[in-house]
Amino acid sequence: MRLFKNWAKTFGENTDINPNSEMLVSNFKNFLSEQNNPESIDLSSFEFHDELDQDFWNQPDDKLDPEIREKLLVIANDFWSSLEVGDAEYDDITFTGSLAAHNYSRFSDVDLHILVDFSDVDDKTDLVREYFNAMKSVWNRLHDILIKGYEVEIYVQDVNDPHEAQGLYSVLNNEWIKKPVLDKQDF
């Protein structure tokens, strides 16, 4: 998503670009080198925090902020209603990733997972996975949703797939599935 947003800045608004042009190739190489230059990365924001991000987890027992929870539910339900999944229903909506743990940074995003039994959608679960991946890619590209300055990224996960995470929060049930524990040796 971030690379997509930087495209116009690098290549301009011209939609009549010849993909074989030397200018395009040269600009693209420059673009990639800027995006992947290790010296240009500020690592100072990658640090351990003694507490969770208080913009999100400011309630007793580190519960999710009620306004943020409501926004995440609206986002997930809006996405879900845009899909063609028949009578299939999701099992849970979860918040995971670095913002649900102690290793968040200014580069974090809100990882919003919708858990579904893919076989409830269709017996061809590989096709279901491809469909969900395509739809979430389009959705994430078309919707520039920020919460507290962090980009919201939707992902549809099969309930039968294992999910490794330091922190995993059920937005639907408003409770921790796996509350993160600060252990600096994990990083």
List each language-model region with its residue ranges.
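Proteolytic processing junctions in secreted/extracellular precursors
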Residues: F4-E13, P19-E22, S26-E34
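Catalytic core of pol beta-like nucleotidyltransferases
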Residues: N37-S108, L115-F187
